[in-house]
């Protein structure tokens, strides 16, 4: 197994994503998110929002311009799975960056190893009130 294709390497890529996204580092997100990036947010009322790479970076840039402070970096790691140059990370997050309210985020993150680094290709995020546990 390549040293880059380990659970530890995926965890490091995800830690980097969390650190840069929670600090609204749009330049870093440009290299973290794959050119074909797509995210799906399922809101608590079951409405769905989708973003491509440009749109999602704009979402973070807007929060930075509005003076949003650093988002919560808390994460609970559930699973890492690597298959060739693809990987999936399943985790739970807590932060207010998706809708302005501190929420629990159930995340399924797909990564692709390309250009010598892991890049986030897809995110499926289900937002739930913190009161749900």
Ranges and model annotations:
Residues 59-62, 89-93:
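Short Pro/Gly-enriched beta-strand edge/turn motifs at strand-loop
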Residues 84-86, 115:
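Residue-level signal for tight coil/turn positions that link beta-strands
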Residues 56, 74-80, 92-95, 106-112, ...:
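Hydrophobic/aromatic beta-strand elements that line small-molecule binding cavities or substrate pockets
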